[in-house]
Amino acid sequence: MGSPSGPGALAKESSTILNQVMITDPAEDIDRENERQLEAAVGLTPVTGLGLVGDDGVDDGGRGGLRSRHDYSNTAGRRKETTFGSYILGQTLGEGEFGKVKLGWKKDGSIQVAIKLIRRESLGSNPSRLPKIYREISILRDLSHPNIVRLHEMVETDRHIGIIMEYASGGELFDYILNNRYLKDNAARRLFAQLVSGVGYLHKKGIVHRDLKLENLLLDRNRNIIITDFGFANTFHATDELGEEIEFNLTNREFVKRMRLDKTDSHGLRRGDLMQTSCGSPCYAAPELVVSDSLYTGRKVDVWSCGVILVSLLLP
């Protein structure tokens, strides 16, 4: 997308920047895209269409002319242009509880990004919401993997908190499958390998995602996976392995209390990857998140979600 043109100055999204932190250069996204493509190219389905099987049972080469649900939300006609920090704001890519994700680009039109705009007023008086946002930013800034979204910048204004990230031009994997029914085995294997690579990287770094689903798996222009939306992500002690006895007795409240498994350390973490907050999306959630409020192991929750995603890739 090129830089928009028109008479007059650009309208500012907000007049006061309170804080601005640069993490990575958005220009690096081109190199990251090439890296993903090189890793995906070895002995697997070419990227021209992901080997998708359409209604006629053959590879339709991509979306088959269909539009995503985001496409329908784009309004015709020209809107007043606004800026956020050093970026021009474009169309809405998605919406959440606290704000929107907008397409953005540098004022010279050279670099596209995704900007998660969180309205300060939407946070209300709940004291846990703002730390959760800062935790997401803290987790993202320490990640560097070709199949995990890259954080570029954090900008705080008097009205919004903006998280500027790598833009995935291929949209959601959910939309891709919705429009094409299912994938051929080779294409599904390639995408699932990328997902597992990213999740394995997170777990080695002591991070669980806790909301893995098709809607949070984006595609770059070459149809390679980018894991995104770390709003429910949390950290854990990666080197503290729990024994089978502990994992087997997590629903036994007396055992949990006796072993002090419900206690947290000075960083707010329990033993190993034990967690208690129920979160994520019901269709992808592990049973222990749905049937009880007991402690659970975070990594296994991610593994379960990966299994659901694999089934979704293969079943019509």
What is each model feature region?
Residues 1-84:
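Intrinsically disordered, low-complexity regulatory segments that flank or precede the catalytic domain
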Residues 89-97, 101:
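Protein kinase glycine-rich loop
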Residues 112, 117-143:
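Conserved N-lobe beta3->alphaC-helix segment of eukaryotic protein kinase catalytic domains
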Residues 149, 158-166, 174-175:
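A conserved loop-to-beta-strand element in the N-lobe of protein kinase catalytic cores
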Residues 154:
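Activation-segment/catalytic-loop signature of the eukaryotic protein kinase fold
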Residues 191-192:
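Activation segment signature within eukaryotic-like protein kinase domains
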